[in-house]
């Protein structure tokens, strides 16, 4: 496996881990939430006001941004 593939695999694992962490955190606050629900936390005021949830959500967004940027860079 190439180094590029190893890095993408690692990023994928980080994204999955963070998605699971975020869903668990959200469900601790609102038990019935789905993975789709947490993509729109503004629909849930309790999540929108939660600084821990927002921090973890931004961590996920950061991982996704790195992955997207890295894939674009590989195509250049």
Give the label of every model feature segment.
Residues 33-72:
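Short, charge-rich amphipathic interface segments used for partner binding and complex assembly
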Residues 1-27:
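Short, charge/polar-rich alpha-helical segments
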Residues 20-34, 68-75:
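Charged/polar positions within long, soluble alpha-helices
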